[in-house]
């Protein structure tokens, strides 16, 4: 078996585990309401059903409970989330970037929160690096879960350096990686990659974002 074949097989195992363990999103609107106080843009993980995915749903639910009576619009990034990692993430970046910039243009007083899980974290990384610098002033917080950053993830990417969060966003980002998660560490526990809701990390990230919304300029 060649190394490329091995990477492909293990990648399918990871994606299948995500699809089986992660609950599909339900009932969440795909597009943010015009000029809500807060706009959340979230990208789901590989092979999760269209919508926010379970991590995104839990993050938004927790954030909603922490921001008082402020209105929250939610946008689920529209992209394949397929195992054609590089092309799929690039497609997601295009969709996320376009939506974020439309929000900034139409609703300049809306505070934006970005989030992504697994491949979705790469989508947000690519988006923040591609958008005009002025957009960063409208983004209050970024929450990343299981961001692909391991050697294994690099192989799935096709080699070379993996995307990282844009420099203008790094100080407003919480980047959470479960212990032994093979996607964001050198670990070997695939189940760790689907533990972000149960571990309480989505609530941790929501608290970070809520504090940023309350205190950041």
Curated annotation (Swiss-Prot):
Q: Which reaction does it catalyse?
A: a fatty acid ester + H2O = an aliphatic alcohol + a fatty acid + H(+); a butanoate ester + H2O = an aliphatic alcohol + butanoate + H(+); pentanoate ester + H2O = pentanoate + an aliphatic alcohol + H(+); a hexanoate ester + H2O = an aliphatic alcohol + hexanoate + H(+)
Question: Which BP terms does GO give this entry?
Answer: lipid catabolic process; medium-chain fatty acid catabolic process; monoacylglycerol catabolic process; short-chain fatty acid catabolic process
Kindly give the Pfam families that the UniProt entry links to this protein.
Cutinase
Q: What is the effect of changing residue 193 to A?
A: Loss of activity
Q: What GO MF terms are annotated? A: carboxylesterase activity; lipase activity; monoacylglycerol lipase activity; short-chain carboxylesterase activity
Q: What is its EC number?
A: 3.1.1.-
Q: Does the keyword Cytoplasm apply?
A: no
Q: Which UniProt keywords apply?
A: Disulfide bond, Hydrolase, Secreted, Serine esterase, Signal, Virulence
Temperature optimum or stability note: Optimum temperature is 37 degrees Celsius.
Q: Which residues form the active site?
A: 118, 181, 193
**Superkingdom classification of source:** Bacteria
Question: Quick one: effect of changing residue 54 to R?
Answer: Shows a strong preference for substrates with a medium chain length ranging between 6 and 8 carbon atoms. 31% and 25% decrease in activity with 6 carbon atoms vinyl esters (VC6) or 8 carbon atoms vinyl esters (VC8) as substrates
Give GO cellular component annotations, separated by semicolons: extracellular region; peptidoglycan-based cell wall
Q: Where in the cell is it found?
A: Secreted
pH and activity: Optimum pH is 7.5.
**Residues under site feature: Transition state stabilizer:** 119
Q: Where is the signal peptide?
A: 1-32
Protein's job = Shows esterase activity, with a preference for short- and medium-chain fatty acids. Also has weak lipase activity, but does not exhibit cutinase activity. Hydrolyzes various p-nitrophenol-linked aliphatic esters, including pNP-butyrate (C4), pNP-valerate (C5), pNP-hexanoate (C6), pNP-octanoate (C8) and pNP-decanoate (C10). Can use pNP-laurate (C12) and pNP-myristate (C14), with lower efficiency. Can also hydrolyze monocaprylin and triolein, with a slow turnover. Induces a strong delayed-type hypersensitivity (DTH) response in animal model of tuberculosis, cellular and humoral immune responses. Induces interferon-gamma (IFN-gamma) release in animal models and in human TB patients. Also induces IL-12 responses in mouse model.
The misc remark on file is: Circulating B cells able to spontaneously generate specific antibodies directed against Culp1 are detected during active tuberculosis and in some latent-tuberculosis cases.
Record's protein name: Carboxylesterase Culp1
